[in-house]
């Protein structure tokens, strides 16, 4: 669990039923695993991130999308790392993105395919509250 690796974990789930079931599981584990209490969750459209708590040192996206959401890049801290599956619905590559901010405020992104082109993976598609897939926005 990420909660054992970080003081704060923020999780966004768009599927309400899945989020409610997960919340029940967390609550059932709190007595035995108090570190899970540092997980803050919300039901929302993850495309827009969680600006109230930004910037984030790390962002992990767990659904496939054909581009990197600009909102998530804005919420990534300087020298922060994002791991995100990017590509068409037929298969994505998992990118590791490091956000560098220079003294003058200019931003550069260092991108690396963590499998170096050797693997594509199909993730569940990134969806919006309207039900559209992110590539249809």
Locations of regions flagged by a protein language model:
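Active-site capping/gating segments
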Residues: 87-137
């Amino acid at each position: 669990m990420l909660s054992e690796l970080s003081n704060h974990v923020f999780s966004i789930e768009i599927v309400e039923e899945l989020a409610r079931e997960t919340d029940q599981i967390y609550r059932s584990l709190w007595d035995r695993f108090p570190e899970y209490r540092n997980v803050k969750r919300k039901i929302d459209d993850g495309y827009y991130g969680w600006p109230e708590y930004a910037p984030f040192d790390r962002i992990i996206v767990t659904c496939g999308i054909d581009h990197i959401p600009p909102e998530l890049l804005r919420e990534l801290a300087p020298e922060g790392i994002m791991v995100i599956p990017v590509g068409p619905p037929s298969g994505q590559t998992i990118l590791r993105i490091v956000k560098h901010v220079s003294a003058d405020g200019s931003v550069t992104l260092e991108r690396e395919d963590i499998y170096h082109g050797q693997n594509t993976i199909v993730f569940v598609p990134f969806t919006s509250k309207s039900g559209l897939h992110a590539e249809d926005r």
